[in-house]
């Protein structure tokens, strides 16, 4: 599934540079106005970090539940511990290339989550990041093998198998 790199809409299509839902053209973080960033991040508590934005938590869980599928904007480089924890109606998450870190328990207890692609840029995944995600059967990861920075227990209480060297087209 493709996601708009700007608004996270699951309706974006490969090769399209302007999303039909948000009318945003993909542009680098430094070219976005504060208002554009605030609009794109309206569902999240977030903070600026050295080289991007960290999602701290979901502040509008109802919005996430209504969409079911969420794409994280391209300028997010970190997802904090427990940021999406207990978003029980979250079914799909689109993680952008450029994301570096997924914190402890970031998606723990997302009981309906079944579709995840982890881009190669992710060098750290914390303990229990996908713990108790019971509907998650397969996780597609771009890395050829588990990177050293991923906690050995990142899939705690989750029976998903990992398909290494995957592409987001799989």
Where are these regions (language model features)?
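Short Cys/His-rich micro-motifs in 6-15 aa windows
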Residues: 22-31
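Consensus positions within tandem repeat domains that build extended binding/scaffold surfaces
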Residues: 60, 81-83, 104-106, 126-129
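Cys/His-rich microdomains that often coordinate metals
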Residues: 8-12, 26-27
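Short cysteine-rich clusters marking metal-coordination/redox-active sites
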Residues: 4-7, 19-22
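Flanking scaffold residues of small Cys/His-coordinated metal-binding clusters
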Residues: 1, 14
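A structural signal for leucine-rich repeat
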Residues: 152-156
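Structural signature of tandem-repeat unit edges
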Residues: 32-54, 62-78, 88-101, 111-124, ...
């Amino acid at each position: 599934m493709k996601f708009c790199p700007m608004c996270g809409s699951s309706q974006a299509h490969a090769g399209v540079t302007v999303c039909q839902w948000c009318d945003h053209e993909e542009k680098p973080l430094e070219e976005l106005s504060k208002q554009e960033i605030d609009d794109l991040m309206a569902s999240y508590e977030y903070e600026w970090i050295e080289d991007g934005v960290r999602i701290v938590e979901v502040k509008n869980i109802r919005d996430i539940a209504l969409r079911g599928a969420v794409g994280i904007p391209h300028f997010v480089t970190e997802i904090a511990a427990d940021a999406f924890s207990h978003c029980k109606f979250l079914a799909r998450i689109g993680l952008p290339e450029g994301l570096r870190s997924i914190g402890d328990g970031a998606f723990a207890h997302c009981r309906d989550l079944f579709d995840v692609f982890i881009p190669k840029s992710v060098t750290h995944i914390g303990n229990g990041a996908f713990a108790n995600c019971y509907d998650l059967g397969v996780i597609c990861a771009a890395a050829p093998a588990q990177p050293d920075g991923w906690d050995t227990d990142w899939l705690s209480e989750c029976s998903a198998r990992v398909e290494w060297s995957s592409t987001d087209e799989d």
